[in-house]
Amino acid sequence: MKLADANNLRPTLVGELLVKPKDHPSGLSHLSAASGLVRVGKRWYVVADDELHLGVFKEPSQVTGKSKKLKKGTLYRLLDGTLPSGKKQRKAAKPDFESLMLLPAFGSPSAGVLFALGSGSKPNRQIGVLLELDHRGKVSGRKALVDLTTLYAPLRKQFADLNIEGAFLSIDETEFVLLHRGNQGDARSACIRYDWSAINHWLIEQGQGKRTTRAPIAKSVQIIQLGYVDGIALSLTDGIALDGGHWAFSAVAEATMDSVQDGTCVGSAVGIINRLGDVIYSCTLLGNPKVEGISVESKNNQWEVTLVTDPDNAEYASQMLKITLPSLH
């Protein structure tokens, strides 16, 4: 499939992901490198791949006679410590949180559990964090660390340059899904499915500190072909479940040969993939924003898609964007 033949859409800017400098460990007025997005009620949760904090942003409210405006967010610490300020040193030390998903509550009454996952692209990027939400969808303060080593190890036999960039739960809550992002050295992106009940049991044990239990093995691995932009393969950056086994994806065409180094983003796309792994709808995004997080809501028989971007430069703020996709019904 050549995405040059697909629709072109211009995203609408919702706003930049701004924070108070006094709250940011580096004194920045924004969150950069946004890489995962989850909506819970009227809150947006955002992970960034070069931070130790989670960004929390409230849905813009409509003021009479004025357009909606995204207000400054707050930061919630995921991991202790401080990352180096130097770009090279920071890249080497960061846990690389590339994925964020919402899981069902593990027992206590709550709006669910957020799960941030490291990419697995380096040994120090194999940590996950579980964050419990209260019944209102706010972070409750309870969290647990997850060692992803045994979850990722079998995947390296198929993907030597593993790079987990997306994660979601199927609508019927039977499957836990990871998305591997390819690169120009190995352009294969993949949808990796697990039995949710097995993963759920493993995560509960991890949360209880039982680190000796090995993670479940994937039940299927689908190679996903997304096409090319100017000769550069599009690769998955995130996904979210839709009805009927379908799922929506975000993707970028980045000129890099591996999972660690950044490259020029020559194109970006969003679309819908069916249960068989076939792309049944896709559109390229005008302006080539490097979209790395996606959330979807059904509105007026259409899909309202919210995206966050990674500018690959800490001096620039990540952006929240919106587009609308047609419903498949």
Predicted ranges, named:
Residues M1-H329:
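Sequence/structural signature of beta-propeller domains
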